[in-house]
């Protein structure tokens, strides 16, 4: 139905090894191939009769007589004799070629090191020419190919007027534990904590993390970290006095207390913390008779079902991507915090068969039973946690709520962002449960009132949704600089693309448009220079698969690139507090690097190298790396980006197997011009398979029209785009269209199964799905309903998105399913439900591997290495045709007896 698809292949290549003008140092692969051709000519009747690697696995693949593949007879018994002189000449030539091959091999082996190119990485080359070491899976798994990056935390000086200060934390034995560096002058370094091995309350304290107060006189220190969920943890907290070099517990009355969160006030005179799901505040420097009374308990009814100041599981995973749900006002006089009531949220049991994450010993007689952890997990359509915003007035010592006019009902409200102004106002971003109606709420904490100042129904505009955003930037009033009113910068939709809008005053619903065009801003804005009225941001203006830094004035004028767009590049950036400096991270396509640079807001001539990744460059120079070829495919009018990873010494005359790697989640992106030697690169370079990734409809940065097309019917268009792209690749002369596979993890696992189901064996022969969603009714409500609505509003869509067509799955040659038993994100229930469907339908063309006590990342007890070992070995078996032999298996006796009978007849 979809065989004829328009295709635009720019064949833009980004290889990992520089081209060499000479072929004299090529791998012995080419010579071996030449020798094999000569020997094959001596014993071949028809050049086209020799089967390829895949076809040789069985006579049914070619329709030839059974004798063609008989291991004891072979075709040689029926070949015609050659003329004697010709045969002698051919043998002589063959022996000369073999001798030359052995001589070349001896020279190659005797060399002290592998041939290397002139540079480690040349994005302009199109093929690997020189020989080098092979990439190994061990290298990839231990992180040898990961670039080094340094996360810099920019901070203000003690008085807030010093720019270019950064906070650096080092590992034990690697310099000062915590220090403040001046990027302009290394001699101005301020050592906050010299050694992370501290003493507190007469006991040793091993610091794992430190946060200085704004005046740099004290440091909040965490120790004894215990992981909770993906982003959260419990720890013991301490206050370190920099001048006195003393350490005291944050909670004086409970030095052993484990807290879920602790954070400084902006002025450094108080710390808010969460213990047992309640909010507390410790005020410092008070003239009190007892340190104990400096701690105020703000809330008192927190417990297993009621959270204050920290998110529950679903808000941590899908909204805040962190462990904090409290926000200090900029003057430190108010504290806003989230109240989360999950009383009505159903529980899901997580089973641990090997370990006991709770740390508790089981009761006598129950040692052999698994440990159960019950998590409040709202699945699609189930009751959500009910959230409210509450406030604490530190001067009046009052805890209060604010009534918002025209607010969402409790069961239809998501609070996704809170931003304080300079004064007593704050902005609250809310959406309805299905994330397609946005309301920006302005709250006056002095008047204790709130109102909706902006409402957008995106479902009426393009049928799409709002993603969770945490990049709203408050802009204070400054009449002298042309800003008479307060305002904020937010992402807005303009002509089908995400852009920046400046809303001023705070209650204005019509923005000043700062950017526009058929491209999108990314997590913007990155910084705002208030003194000069400059907004900095990252965007895709040059290409959806690149990232460059740009700037624009607050009035929308003077749009310009900050990084050079004359060359391909993917950049990330973080700015100093006054925007005069930036940590610029170049992620590829060449060897990544990091520099601190001066910005247009400061001294643009300033450059300081932070990381050159010289070790990675040396490693790349010694290895044969795949080449990366970027192109687009046009499917149903959408230009979709593709990256093809080709093996070193790619030969277009060969027939290569192809592996498609997929994620495909809404708003995601896999195809990008970044340096990445990962599992996919290993498959291409180490196993010499082609690996293709295509970002289909639903993915990000190609406009909302392509993105929102998947709403309400996840999997259909995404799988369609994978299949159509695979058909295009199957027509390429260097691709073996009978050996095409697909694999993915999480949403990519769902995409793998959905693609196999929709394709029904016509294009993809194999698939490997790790931790897949198989029924969206099993996944969490906030994520799922954003893209699918609720099951109550979209029953047919949920049925269509479920992996349920077992007969279609049975038409692929074989697929692999893997899952962590203790997955708290994509529950094992997904894979078990699919296995039950396969059992009922008597479908058996699959393999399964489960990992006890592993969560969604699958790490417990060497599990992560096992995942990739299994993927590699299973893929080799698939492309070697081994799974084709599993169909119609017979006992060895039934096979060997006809062979013996036939051999007797030939004697």
UniProtKB/Swiss-Prot annotation:
Catalytic activity of the protein: Release of an N-terminal dipeptide, Xaa-Yaa-|-Zaa-, from a polypeptide, preferentially when Yaa is Pro, provided Zaa is neither Pro nor hydroxyproline
GO biological process: proteolysis
Alphabetic keyword roster: Aminopeptidase, Glycoprotein, Hydrolase, Membrane, Protease, Serine protease, Signal-anchor, Transmembrane, Transmembrane helix, Vacuole
Bias kind Low complexity: ranges: 22-36
EC number: 3.4.14.5
Cellular component, GO, one term: fungal-type vacuole membrane
Subcellular location as annotated: Vacuole membrane
Membrane topology according to the record: Single-pass type II membrane protein
Glycosylated sites: 185, 341, 800
Composition bias type Basic and acidic residues, residue spans: 1-11
Vacuolar side: 110-907
Coarse class of the protein's main subcellular location: membrane
Topological domains annotated Cytoplasmic: 1-88
Active site positions, chain numbering: 746, 823, 856
Transmembrane segments annotated in the record for this chain: 89-109
Region (Disordered) location: 1-71
GO molecular function per UniProt: aminopeptidase activity; dipeptidyl-peptidase activity; serine-type peptidase activity
Role played: Type IV dipeptidyl-peptidase which removes N-terminal dipeptides sequentially from polypeptides having unsubstituted N-termini provided that the penultimate residue is proline.
UniProt similarity note: Belongs to the peptidase S9B family.
Protein name: Probable dipeptidyl-aminopeptidase B
Species of origin: Tuber melanosporum (strain Mel28)
Gene: DAPB
């Amino acid at each position: 139905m979809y065989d004829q698809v328009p295709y635009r292949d720019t064949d833009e290549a980004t290889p990992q090894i520089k081209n060499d003008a000479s072929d004299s140092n090529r791998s012995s692969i080419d010579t071996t191939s030449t020798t094999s051709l000569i020997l094959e000519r001596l014993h071949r009747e028809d050049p086209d009769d020799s089967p390829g690697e895949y076809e040789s696995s069985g006579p049914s693949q070619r329709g030839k007589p059974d004798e063609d593949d008989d291991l004891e007879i072979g075709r040689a018994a029926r070949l015609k004799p050659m003329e004697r002189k010709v045969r002698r000449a051919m043998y002589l030539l063959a022996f000369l070629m073999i001798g030359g091959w052995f001589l070349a091999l001896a020279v190659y082996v005797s060399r002290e090191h592998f041939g290397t190119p002139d540079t480690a990485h040349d994005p302009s080359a199109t093929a690997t020419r020189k020989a080098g070491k092979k990439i190994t899976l061990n290298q990839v798994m231990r992180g040898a190919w990961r670039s080094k990056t340094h996360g810099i935390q920019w901070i203000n000086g003690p008085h807030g007027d010093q720019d270019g200060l950064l906070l650096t934390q080092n590992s034990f034995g690697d310099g000062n534990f915590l220090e403040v560096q001046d990027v302009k002058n290394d001699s101005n370094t301020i050592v906050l904590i010299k050694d992370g091995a501290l003493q507190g309350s007469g006991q040793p304290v091993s610091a794992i993390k430190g946060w200085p107060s704004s005046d740099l006189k004290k440091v909040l220190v965490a120790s004894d970290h215990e992981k909770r969920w993906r982003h959260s943890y419990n720890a013991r907290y301490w206050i370190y006095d920099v001048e006195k070099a003393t350490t005291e517990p944050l909670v004086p009355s409970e030095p052993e207390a484990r807290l879920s969160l602790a954070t400084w006030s902006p002025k450094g005179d108080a710390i808010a913390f969460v213990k047992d799901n309640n909010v507390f505040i410790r005020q410092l420097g008070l003239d009190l008779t007892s340190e104990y009374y400096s701690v105020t308990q703000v809330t008192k009814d927190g417990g297993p079902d009621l959270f204050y100041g920290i998110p529950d599981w679903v808000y941590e995973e899908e909204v805040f991507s962190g462990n904090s749900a409290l926000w200090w006002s900029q003057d430190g006089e108010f504290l806003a915090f989230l109240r989360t009531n999950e009383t009505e949220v159903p529980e899901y049991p997580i089973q641990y068969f090997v370990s006991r994450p709770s740390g508790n010993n089981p009761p006598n007689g129950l040692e052999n039973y698994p440990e159960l952890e019950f998590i409040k997990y709202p699945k699609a359509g189930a009751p959500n946690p009910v959230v409210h915003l509450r406030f604490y007035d530190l001067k009046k010592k009052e805890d209060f709520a604010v009534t918002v006019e025209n607010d969402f009902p409790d069961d239809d409200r998501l609070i996704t962002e809170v931003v304080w102004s300079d004064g007593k106002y704050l902005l609250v971003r809310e959406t309805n449960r299905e994330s397609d109606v946005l309301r920006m709420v302005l709250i006056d904490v002095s008047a204790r009132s709130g109102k909706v100042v902006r409402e957008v129904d995106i479902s009426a505009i393009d049928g799409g949704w709002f993603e969770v955003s945490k990049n709203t930037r408050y802009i204070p009033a400054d009449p002298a600089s042309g800003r008479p009113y307060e305002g904020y910068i937010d992402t807005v939709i303009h002509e089908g693309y995400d852009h920046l809008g400046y809303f001023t005053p705070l209650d204005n619903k019509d923005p000043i448009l700062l950017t526009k065009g058929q491209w999108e801003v990314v997590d913007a804005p990155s910084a705002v220079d208030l003194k000069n009225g400059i907004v900095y941001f990252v965007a895709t203006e040059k290409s959806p698969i690149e990232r460059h830094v740009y700037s624009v004035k607050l009035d929308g004028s003077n749009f310009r690139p900050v990084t050079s767009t004359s060359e391909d590049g993917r950049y990330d950036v973080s700015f100093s507090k006054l925007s005069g400096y930036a940590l610029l991270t170049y992620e590829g396509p060449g060897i990544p690097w990091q520099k601190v640079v001066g910005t247009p807001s400061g001294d643009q001539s300033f450059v300081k190298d932070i990381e050159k990744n010289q070790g990675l460059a040396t490693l790349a120079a010694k290895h044969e790396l795949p080449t990366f070829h970027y192109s687009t495919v046009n499917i149903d009018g959408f230009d979709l980006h593709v990256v093809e990873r080709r093996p070193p010494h790619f030969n277009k005359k060969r027939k290569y197997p192809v592996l498609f790697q997929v994620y495909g989640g809404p708003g995601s992106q896999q195809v990008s011009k970044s340096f990445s030697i990962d599992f996919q690169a290993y498959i291409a370079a180490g196993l010499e398979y082609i690996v293709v990734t295509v970002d289909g409809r639903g993915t990000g940065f190609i406009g909302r029209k392509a993105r929102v097309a998947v709403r309400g019917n996840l999997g259909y268009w995404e799988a369609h785009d994978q299949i159509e792209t695979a058909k295009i690749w199957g027509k390429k002369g260097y691709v073996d269209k009978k050996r095409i596979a697909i694999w993915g993890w999480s949403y990519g696992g769902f995409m793998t199964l959905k693609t196999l189901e929709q394709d029904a064996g016509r294009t993809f022969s194999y698939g490997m799905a790790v931790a897949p969603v198989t029924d969206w009714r099993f996944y969490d409500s906030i994520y799922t309903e954003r893209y699918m609505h609720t099951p109550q509003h979209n029953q047919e869509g949920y049925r269509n998105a479920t992996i349920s067509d077992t007969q279609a799955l049975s038409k692929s040659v074989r697929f692999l399913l893997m899952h962590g038993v203790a997955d708290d994100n994509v529950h094992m229930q997904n894979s078990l439900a699919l296995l039950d469907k396969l059992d009922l339908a008597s479908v058996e063309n699959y393999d399964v591997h489960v990992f006890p006590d592993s969560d969604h990342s699958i790490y417990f007890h060497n599990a992560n290495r096992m995942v990739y070992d299994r993927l590699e070995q299973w893929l080799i078996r698939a492309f070697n045709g081994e799974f084709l032999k599993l169909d119609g298996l017979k006992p060895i006796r039934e096979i060997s007896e006809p062979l013996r009978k036939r051999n007797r007849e030939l004697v």
